[in-house]
Amino acid sequence: HLDLPAFNHHRASDDAATVGYMLIPFWKMLHERGIHTLQAVNKEMEKLRPLGSKSNRFPKHIIILARNKVGLKNLYQLISASNLKYFKRVPTIPKSLLLEHREGIIVGSACEAGELFRAVLRGESEEKLMSIADMYDYLEIQPIGNNAFLMRNGTVDTEEGLRDLNRRIVALGDKMGKPVVATGDVHFLEPDDALFRSIIMHARGFDDAEQQAPLYFKTTDEMLEEFSYLGEEKAREVVITNPNMIADSCERMKAFLSEKGTYAPTFPGANDELRNMALKKAHEIYGDELPEVVQKRLDKELNSIIGNGYSSLYLMAQRLVHKSNSDGYLVGSRGSVGSSFVANMAGITEVNALQPHYVCPNCRHSDFDIDRTKYACGVDMPDKDCPVCGAKYKKLGSEIPFEVFLGFKGDKTPDIDLNFSGDYQPVAHKYVEVMFGEGHAFRAGTISGVKDKIAYGYVRSYCEANGINAGKDEMDRMVQGCTGVKKTTGQHPGGIVIVPKENDIMEFTPVQYPADRSEGDTITTHFDFHAMDDRLVKLDILGHDDPTVLRMLKDITGLDPQTIPLDDPETMKIFRTSEPLGVTLDELDCDVGSIAIPEFGTTFVRQMLKDTRPTTMEELLRISGLSHGTDVWLGNAQELVLSGTATLSQVICTRDDIMNYLILRGGDPSMSFKTMESVRKGRGLTPEMEEHMRSIDTPQWFIDSCKKIKYMFPRAHAAAYVMMAFRVAYYKVHMPLAFYSVYYTVRADAFDIAQAEGGAQKVLANINAIKKKGNDADKKEEDLLTILEVVFEMNKRGIELLPVDLYKSKASQFIIEDGKIRPPFSSV
């Protein structure tokens, strides 16, 4: 601002000289204000000080285009710095930083909020304007409608005055030899879309939201007409010639590195380490000479994993799980990683993906000669003794194809999702950074749009404020126009993006803090991870209650959850009746015992259990798949089961069912896989897929069911969740005091002692009071309702809730005391 000469900061002699240079223009400013004494300076400062506050230091807008890959990286570095180091209400870029990263980028002067336009508006001298414009590669002018607000606020008198501002910028460009470009400052596509922007801006508190500038995407003819006052030749130059020249100077490139496909992290010697690890474990379980089924599956998977460069990803997950287990916390697998037998042998998942089989824990003899049409889950097979040594066989296998995880050609990017204890999740996140080094592990960023319910609130508020009496169809149209508009940025609850050591995150994405915090340790990708999920590997390290619950139950009871038999008959019964609990729960309109069991405790799933009355682990697994999909059970499989068209074992429950079923009927494996992928993503069936299904006599109900599905769980995910849930259920049946105390402790935030004390009848009255509210019950009451149902069941089982005691209660932990449960202070 003062045109000071270059100098070395914080060097006394330079600082003193610079202050001297500053004084000269300051004296001039003082004289212009009629100030000639020190007292007058102090008095004037009272008026000037508010003008210099941070709230009045508005940054100027600029446009930055990446000309080439060097420029793209510089652009990402500027975006990152603006979000991490220079965020002041909005991301800002110091001019000095922009000049440091000038290579490969093109800088435009932007809209009315740009430095140049504002200087023109202030009537700065030509010399000053040339000094400002010197930094820009091209100068921008925009339709006068964009700046009509300057007439409304009295800054410019007429439309011709707005045109004169543009004329001055054009003349400046001509004099300096800089291209002038007509731009639209486009914020929406069609003119009518201005209404949606008005609604959004009204929701954000703008007083002039209804007075929208025509910031729609104009055609070339519209732009030529808009700038016709410059003359035909000049109008074509700013609308067509110069924009094309700038566009042509930019290389065609993608937003992130893509030459190699997926850029996966690597560990030295990972291929051999993973192979040796998997084979060692397989030999420990299945003997020195591996059964053909085991050897074939290992060879197939290892060749695909190693051949596609995913060994290091497996090792990374293995090390995380091993560390968590060593620290005393179980880890549950999510997603389709349980489809990999190698993952099971490496200790990443408990799910054994092989076909159902017996194996002897003593002599390692195995039996794979099982009727696979009768058993899909090894746990459901009858007990059997080893014919070699007489020891009781272990029953393993979940019948899950590997292709669900990596595809038939190993070309599907693997996504390893792991459920860590919520208490342990931060430790696991830090350990990833230790493994790969600082600057190579980032939280996966998310971009959230306006949800339809929020959009409805925006529209209703806008209509009320403007006296608009809109009908339902018009309201729906306005809601639809606002739904999905970017609202904020955030972070994936557990996703960690890994950048290989030989790469830089700036080759893929800028980085930033999540929108709800402007500092701290959490740095996320600037792009939504889904935009680049085929380029960088994401490891999902999620926090989950189940591992925490099982750790606490183990500490209280001394029973290791991994030793719990997954075929315990009494535990299996509670998924079809409350009889093993010794109570009936008719008052809750519930005749199963699965209340408070993960994945099976909600009213929705309890109704599914009532409809299906499962008796096997396989049926529980299928119910889990049905309950987590979208349009898989309701209006689909439920109707097929209740009408007798198909049984629970026949309907589509998990995505694997589609591929397995089609291949079993003689379908082409590759087409069967593509069909599964299309259906599970909610894309339905292509004519080619439907023709393939009919060629192998697929029943019409199966085809129709595929068309209805919007999303499906993988079988491996369901298997992992059901194993965890069954273990928790075992404690509920056989060790109820420990179960209830831990359940309440983990959900202490929702517990309200005033509502939960007083015995079964009082608790039931409180339950009914909340139910009577229906949809008017708030989230807190809905969470409390679940807690109260558990308390009611516990009371009926003869377990009392003691009062909070100043001397006996803990801070936040429910404790067992004389066959009863004492709440903590946090429950008050």
Place the predicted regions along the sequence by residue.
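Hydrophobic or amphipathic alpha-helical targeting/insertion segments
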Residues: 28, 49-87
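Common nucleic-acid-contacting/processivity interface regions adjacent to the catalytic cores
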Residues: 31-56, 495-513
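Short acidic/histidine-rich active-site segments
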Residues: 8, 12, 178-192, 333-334, ...
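Noncatalytic, beta-rich nucleic-acid-contacting surfaces in large DNA/RNA-processing enzymes
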Residues: 188, 199, 207, 265-828
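Active-site or pore-adjacent capping/gating segments
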Residues: 62, 194-277
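Short low-complexity, flexible loop/linker segments enriched in glycine and/or proline
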Residues: 23-25, 154-156, 193-201, 346-349, ...
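Acidic, Mg2+-coordinating catalytic module of metal-dependent nucleases/exonucleases
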Residues: 2-46, 249
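Domain-core and long-helix interface of multi-subunit machines
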Residues: 70-193, 276, 280-316
